[in-house]
């Protein structure tokens, strides 16, 4: 029998429903979009052209040439940059809990910064591997920069490209302010980077932004440029981030972590104290992270709220304000908007994914 050549592509993010697609080509990017969102594609291209001269600040190489693919039938709001094949994916539905920065501008300022990071990691030995292994070789470079640093640097980018970016919102640092003494944690620092199933830990976007912004102020430059430069040329060295930080800045990740939160806590402690009139409704079990969201009053004696924890599906519970007791009244799916009450009913929406097409996600109105 003879050998035959076969070609295929990686299946990574799901398929779109049947649509007529178009493309806009420029020397730097290619916009790929369904005809139904031509206006959004052109607006996004305008933002790309606007931020391109400055999006590579702090790095020695600008963004790579990369296509942008738009998905308008997914109500979930997100974006990402990936290899295999190389592209930027945009879910065009604006985030429900967004702020004054336009959604498409935020996506461009964040995801296009990742294209800068990828381009700086795809150098030296990593670039040589890509000639042999294709984009599989380029993905090895992503191991040379921690994910929290990549996301923190991208959040800093979107914050600097706006007057009120994500990093400037009080809610973005609220969890750290509430916990206090984060920088003095000596027992288990890894949980702040890796997460925990026991304690509430802010995600790597919040952690990365705080460390990256502190490092920028502390050293007066983007320290991840040299980390990427060293890692792409020495990928065979274990822990390239640790070696590069020690070589160029005489520091390490743990030291950066402690210095960042020591500085933040000194600032937060200097702020005027505010009164706290909150009254607990129900006693929480020890060592069990539970979230109660969006409380709605039921007369003078009860409150209905969405309850989520780590081991059960989310559900609506009614809490007796006098005794603190609670009972489950309804289980939910992935809630997409804030519940409200009207005509004696609680109304909310949930995401509903198509059985056939992963990139068709609707928002279903629900009530009880």
Residue ranges and their predicted role:
Residues 267-290, 319-337, 367-368:
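Multi-bladed beta-propeller domains
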Residues 8-140, 146:
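Juxtacatalytic substrate-recognition/specificity segment
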Residues 15-16, 102-107, 115, 120-213, ...:
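Acidic/His/Gly-enriched intrinsically disordered linker/tail segments
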Residues 167, 288-290, 306-316, 331-336, ...:
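A flexible loop/linker signature enriched in serine peptidases of the S9 family
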Residues 300-301, 343-345:
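Short coil/turn segments that connect the beta-strands within blades of beta-propeller domains
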Residues 1-6:
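C-terminal segment of classical bacterial N-terminal signal peptides
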